[in-house]
Swiss-Prot record:
PANTHER family: COCAINE AND AMPHETAMINE REGULATED TRANSCRIPT PROTEIN (PTHR16655), COCAINE- AND AMPHETAMINE-REGULATED TRANSCRIPT PROTEIN (PTHR16655:SF0). Satiety factor closely associated with the actions of leptin and neuropeptide y; this anorectic peptide inhibits both normal and starvation-induced feeding and completely blocks the feeding response induced by neuropeptide Y and regulated by leptin in the hypothalamus. One of its GO terms (biological process) is somatostatin secretion. Its main location: secreted. InterPro entries: CART (IPR009106), CART_C_sf (IPR036722). This is Cocaine- and amphetamine-regulated transcript protein. SUPFAM superfamilies: Satiety factor CART (cocaine and amphetamine regulated transcript). GO terms for cellular component: extracellular space; secretory granule; synapse. Belongs to the CART family. The keyword Phosphoprotein applies.
Amino acid sequence: MESSRLRLLPLLGAALLLLLPLLGARAQEDAELQPRALDIYSAVDDASHEKELPRRQLRAPGAMLQIEALQEVLKKLKSKRIPIYEKKYGQVPMCDAGEQCAVRKGARIGKLCDCPRGTSCNSFLLKCL
């Protein structure tokens, strides 16, 4: 009985190895038939295809003004350029000696800048001394 199990085990393993490529090919065909979410959205930032909200869905009379104000803010944020010192972490612009500065630790009051060599930002006066 034990010898028949030992003979059957390699045969089952060989059959499984032969069937695996066939099962993998079928799964690959199924994956190719499914639509991809990336194909639905275009890479172009064109807002002309976006839907407008129907006016009956707007409940407040000032809602249109709020939407227009938000759209203006979004346009400004898109056009705003980030200063180089904000992009590079750990690097901030230099302050002049005696100018108001900000401490990097804790709550910060004042302009974010680093004091020149030989001076340090006084946390009480918030000036480069």
